[in-house]
Design a protein with these regions (language model features):
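Conserved Switch II/interswitch segment of TRAFAC-class P-loop GTPases
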Residues: 42-47, 74-84, 95-157, 170-184, ...
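Glycine-rich, flexible loop/turn motifs
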Residues: 25-33, 40-42, 50-53, 111, ...
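Amphipathic alpha-helical transducer elements in NTP-driven molecular machines
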Residues: 34, 48-51, 64-70, 84-98, ...
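Short capping/connector residues at structural and topological boundaries
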Residues: 6, 34, 39-42, 49-51, ...
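C-terminal-of-GTPase-core extension/linker across diverse P-loop GTPases
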Residues: 2-8, 13, 19, 146-350, ...
Length: 361
């Protein structure tokens, strides 16, 4: 499995600049609405220093980090669900995303127009949330007559109708399904066929002035706008500059802004955490590689991420923790120290497990 994050935001908030920095891919980043007409898709690797060390230990030719896909989606405006701007054409582009990342403008620059004429992070967040909620309302409202008709023929559909009716009420109250479904007792799995947008977790990137990156009082105000969701703060222009610099110059620039690492790295990790994902590792002469699995995945399920045959014919998993392996200095030394163990089908994977699966098909 891989993580896909849909990047949404009002026009001119720095969304495409952020995407360019993420993927080192120069999509059109222009100071006018809808510079992004079709979604740009980029795949980047989850930053993971462990892979470099594994490659050293195993003499790996290649390093393959866990992939993260970012989809840069055309700017939406107030009324998009009713056809304003580019209308709801953007909706189809984010239905397949695992999570929605809202890029919110929190910087002041008179040379960069704001679509609503003023910079207000709270208003921008409300606009985007409202458009996504309205889009889901339309989807549920359109589907309900069909679902009710099906329920008359198939009794098992009654639960789906009840879930859809409860979801409609929640959305009509201005609450996203991700936030409100649990407390309302709505089983979102029953509504999977509707591909509702607000069932996805949201995370937020605040594009702030470089001078505000160390202003904790200001950042706390922004965090409060989206709590309990995760917030990441960065200056998209700085992030764009960082990718053009060598390691020493990049570190100097980061330190000058009070940061220890690029905001992009934090964003990718927050995406993993928000979705409850983790990585396990494999290594050999050909490659050192990270694989993405949900927290709580069993060893056979993790094996299936590599190939379905691995899961179907799973026998055992030879596992050592990354820290134990590095401390030992080699796999043979880790085995001699009793740090390598054989695990069966009920084993729950841990982040940083270094694994070799044994299977028979």
């Amino acid at each position: 499995m891989s993580l896909t994050i849909g990047i949404v935001g009002l026009p001119n908030v720095g969304k495409s600049t952020l995407f360019n920095a993420l993927t080192k891919n120069d999509v059109l980043a222009a100071n006018y609405p809808f510079a992004t007409i079709e979604p740009n898709v980029g795949v980047v690797g989850l930053p993971d220093e462990r892979l470099g060390k594994l490659a050293e230990l195993f003499g790996s030719e290649k390093i393959l980090p866990a992939p993260v896909s970012f989809v840069d989606i055309a700017g939406l405006v107030r009324g998009a669900s009713k056809g304003q701007g580019r209308g709801n054409a953007f909706l189809a582009n984010i239905r397949d995303a695992s999570a929605i990342c809202q890029v919110v403008r929190a910087f002041s620059d008179p040379n960069v127009l704001h679509v609503d004429g003023k910079v207000s992070p709270a208003d921008d967040i409300e606009t985007i949330n409202t458009e996504l909620i309205l889009a889901d309302l339309q989807t549920v409202e359109k589907a309900l007559p069909r679902l009710q008709k099906e329920a008359k023929l198939k009794k098992e559909k009654a639960a789906t109708v009840a879930a859809a009716e409860a979801a409609f009420k929640l959305l009509n109250d201005g609450v996203t399904l991700y936030q409100g479904a649990g407390p309302a007792g709505i089983e979102l799995d029953l509504l999977a066929e509707l591909h509702l947008l607000t069932t996805k977790p949201f995370l937020y990137v605040f594009n702030v002035d470089e001078t505000e990156l160390g202003n904790e009082a200001f950042l706390d105000e922004l965090r409060a706008l989206v709590a309990p969701a995760e917030a990441v703060f960065m200056d998209a222009k700085i992030e764009s500059e960082l990718i053009e610099l060598d390691e020493a110059d990049a570190l100097e620039l980061l330190q000058s802004t009070g940061q220890s690492e690029p905001g992009l790295n934090r964003l990718i990790r927050v995406g993993f955490d928000t979705l409850g994902l983790q990585t396990y590792l494999t290594a050999g002469p050909k490659e050192a590689r990270a694989w993405t699995v949900p927290v709580g995945a069993t060893a056979p399920e993790a094996a299936g991420v590599i190939h379905s045959d691995f899961q179907r014919g799973f026998i055992k998993a030879e596992i050592v923790s990354y820290d134990d392996l590095v401390a030992a200095g080699s796999m043979s030394a880790a085995k001699a120290a009793g740090k390598v163990r054989m695990e069966g089908k009920d084993y729950i994977m841990k982040d940083g497990d270094v694994v070799e699966f044994r299977f028979n098909v």
